[in-house]
């Protein structure tokens, strides 16, 4: 019997190194379905999956990294290799913390990801994916994510063009209670839609690929609907605010689409531009382009970059705390087994001693005498195991699993000798192992010299 160290292996398919198509392939199906699939793979004992419009990540726990890597490779078989970032044990734990802090987000420090990690945790727990290893890892990530947002300025100010455009519109025209049209479903359009999610009463998403628009709409908590790009004119007529951020080479919104829409704020954050020249001259229509909006983001970006350095240091500290927590728990498994075995031996020997007293004395042991004998046995167990307990904790701190597993073989359940298997008593002090002899008093050693007397 050996103590299992629970290796975490992770895989990330995100906006930093994968296309939207690859992310969607990796995120096929629900988070719970993905966790169940991973748990069905050989050697996987725990699993956690996080899916958003900009990332699909999976983490598994196995007895070795090879088993975990094979399980994740099978799970992501349809995704291009260059779109997958594989993560070792330490990398997985740190990466998950960075994700929860918003350091891996399109917009550094954005708040939504923390709630998404929490939801993914509940999803994984719901299907039995979260065991002791991932439970500690995810809860630590959530903890450091909350610390980052309360102790630093990581989430202050608008730093993306999408969120900056919405803030710009809010300051000049107001967006609270408005109907907003978002044209596009890529990076900037997604950020704009999420920035509008709280203040707007309704969001319309228009995109050439309807599936992507629907995926974005599903992530919004406000009332959301989806239309095709060919229906932009009708959607614009119903909107108070229009944000356009497609990757089209041609104009997506022309002057005819905005004719007669009334008071409308149009934010064109696409490159090249989505809105045809001349739209700004239409009565009631105010058009703002990239040059106007980009200036809003510079100061906020600088503040978040500075905060990110503080958060990275915070992650390093919390990672060390997590590793210490893991090591202590694993050592405690062995210590518990050691005490469990000692308690069984103590109980057996107490029964033997009490039986002898009862055989030799008509009235046996009194209740007080029984308490004294049992107290002495407890004290012996505690004193004898005190030094090994500390040694095991020291071994865990030093990752000395050979010593820990050797102790488990010696003291673990099912390995105690039968009562008839008596140990060999050394003939003299020289027969006592040197390491043990150094810990024994001279009086104890002298007892071995008188064993034959």
UniProtKB/Swiss-Prot annotation:
Q: Does the keyword Flavoprotein apply?
A: no
InterPro entries with a match to the protein in the record: 4pyrrol_synth_GluRdtase, 4pyrrol_synth_GluRdtase_dimer, 4pyrrol_synth_GluRdtase_N, GluRdtase_CS, GluRdtase_dimer_dom_sf, GluRdtase_N_sf, NAD(P)-bd_dom_sf, Shikm_DH/Glu-tRNA_Rdtase
Site location (Important for activity): 95
Going by the record, the broad EC class of this enzyme is: oxidoreductase
Q: What is its EC number?
A: 1.2.1.70
Catalyses: (S)-4-amino-5-oxopentanoate + tRNA(Glu) + NADP(+) = L-glutamyl-tRNA(Glu) + NADPH + H(+)
Asked whether the UniProt record includes Nucleotide-binding among its keywords, one would answer no
Q: Name one Pfam family in it.
A: GlutR_N
- Binding of substrate occurs at 52-55, 105, 110-112, 116
| Record key words, sorted | NADP, Oxidoreductase, Porphyrin biosynthesis
Query: Which molecular function GO terms apply here?
Result: glutamyl-tRNA reductase activity; NADP binding
* Gene Ontology annotations of biological process type: protoporphyrinogen IX biosynthetic process from glutamate
User: Which CDD domains does this chain map to?
Assistant: NAD_bind_Glutamyl_tRNA_reduct
**Sequence segments annotated as region (Disordered):** 413-453
Bias category Low complexity: which stretches? 413-424
Domain comment as written in the entry = Possesses an unusual extended V-shaped dimeric structure with each monomer consisting of three distinct domains arranged along a curved 'spinal' alpha-helix. The N-terminal catalytic domain specifically recognizes the glutamate moiety of the substrate. The second domain is the NADPH-binding domain, and the third C-terminal domain is responsible for dimerization.
Question: What does the subunit section of this Swiss-Prot or TrEMBL entry state?
Answer: Homodimer.
Which family would the database say this protein is a member of?
Belongs to the glutamyl-tRNA reductase family.
Q: What does this protein do?
A: Catalyzes the NADPH-dependent reduction of glutamyl-tRNA(Glu) to glutamate 1-semialdehyde (GSA).
Q: What is this protein called?
A: Glutamyl-tRNA reductase
């Amino acid at each position: 019997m050996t103590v299992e160290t629970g290796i975490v292996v992770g895989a990330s398919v995100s906006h930093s190194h994968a296309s939207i198509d690859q992310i969607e392939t990796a995120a096929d199906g629900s988070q719970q379905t993905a966790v169940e699939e991973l748990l069905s793979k050989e050697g996987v004992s725990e699993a956690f999956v996080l899916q958003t419009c900009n990332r699909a990540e999976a983490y598994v726990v196995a007895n070795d990294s090879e088993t975990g890597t094979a399980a994740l490779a099978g799970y992501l078989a349809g995704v291009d290799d260059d779109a997958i970032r594989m993560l070792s044990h330490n990398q997985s734990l740190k990466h998950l913390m960075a994700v929860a802090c918003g350091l891996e987000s399109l917009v550094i420090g954005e708040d939504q990801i923390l709630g998404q990690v929490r939801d993914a945790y509940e999803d994984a727990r719901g299907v039995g994916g979260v065991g002791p290893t991932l439970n500690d890892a995810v809860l630590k990530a959530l903890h450091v994510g909350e610390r980052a947002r309360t102790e630093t300025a990581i989430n202050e100010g608008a730093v993306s063009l999408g969120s900056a455009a919405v803030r710009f519109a809010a300051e000049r025209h107001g967006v609270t209670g408005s109907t907003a049209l978002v044209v596009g479903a890529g990076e900037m359009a997604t950020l704009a839609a999420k920035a509008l999610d709280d203040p707007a009463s309704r969001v319309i998403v228009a995109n050439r690929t309807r599936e992507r628009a629907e995926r974005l709409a599903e992530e919004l908590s406000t009332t959301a609907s989806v239309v095709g790009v060919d229906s932009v004119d009708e959607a614009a007529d119903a909107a108070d605010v229009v944000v356009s951020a497609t990757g089209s080479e041609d104009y997506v919104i022309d002057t005819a689409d905005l004719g007669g829409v009334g008071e409308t704020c149009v934010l064109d954050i696409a490159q090249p531009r989505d809105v045809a020249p001349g739209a700004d001259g239409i009565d009631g229509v105010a058009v703002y382009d990239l040059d106007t909006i980009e200036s809003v983001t510079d100061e906020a970006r600088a503040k978040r970059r500075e905060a990110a350095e503080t958060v990275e240091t915070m992650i390093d500290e919390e990672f060390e705390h997590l590793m210490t927590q893991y090591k202590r728990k694993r050592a405690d498994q062995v210590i518990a087994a050691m005490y469990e075995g000692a308690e069984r031996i103590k109980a057996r020997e107490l029964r033997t001693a009490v039986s002898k007293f009862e055989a030799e004395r008509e009235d046996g042991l009194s209740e007080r005498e029984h308490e004294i004998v049992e107290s002495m046995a407890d004290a012996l167990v505690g004193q004898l195991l005190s030094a090994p307990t500390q040694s095991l904790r020291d071994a865990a701190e030093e990752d000395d699993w050979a010593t820990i597993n050797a102790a488990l073989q010696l003291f673990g359940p099912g390995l105690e000798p039968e009562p008839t298997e008596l140990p060999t008593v050394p003939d003299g002090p020289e027969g006592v192992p040197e390491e043990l002899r150094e810990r024994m008093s001279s009086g104890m050693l002298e007892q071995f010299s008188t064993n034959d007397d």
